[in-house]
């Protein structure tokens, strides 16, 4: 039995982490075991579709994508998912298709939105003493 060609990539946003498994298949795209069409709300679903729509859905009829995402909120998870999918498509094309198609995908993703391939490293600033947040201070009384 021959192994199915597959790659595994990850995407991150704040504390959300998504791991995408891209392999040869029949065009299934699942997020946490559910079809991608069930991602709610609709605006966030379109964000998840962006990497696929940029280069055309017809190119991915022979690729299965399964994404497992944990941590963070809804929006952070969606951005982690789209990054994992974009990186997975590029890794799959580099490993199993050809270098030229990989470069075309990479160029299209970078021109559209750099965060599809490069993680946003910003994190919340830690809370300090003397206030209720990172920068805010408790009110001072002079008498």
From Swiss-Prot:
**Presence of keyword Ribonucleoprotein:** yes
Q: Name one GO biological process term.
A: maturation of SSU-rRNA from tricistronic rRNA transcript (SSU-rRNA, 5.8S rRNA, LSU-rRNA)
Organism, scientific name: Maudiozyma exigua (Yeast)
Residues modified to N-acetylserine: 2
UniProt keyword Acyltransferase, yes or no: no
User: Origin, by domain of life?
Assistant: Eukaryota
Which keywords does the record carry? Answer: Acetylation, Ribonucleoprotein, Ribosomal protein
Region (Disordered) location: 123-143
Which InterPro entries would you find in this protein's record? Answer: Ribosomal_Su5_D2-typ_SF (IPR020568), Ribosomal_uS9 (IPR000754), Ribosomal_uS9_CS (IPR020574), Ribsml_uS5_D2-typ_fold_subgr (IPR014721)
The gene behind this protein is RPS16
GO CC annotations, alphabetized: cytosolic small ribosomal subunit
Homology family: Belongs to the universal ribosomal protein uS9 family.
* MF terms in GO: RNA binding; structural constituent of ribosome
Q: Where is the composition biased (Basic residues)?
A: 134-143
Identify this protein by name. Answer: Small ribosomal subunit protein uS9
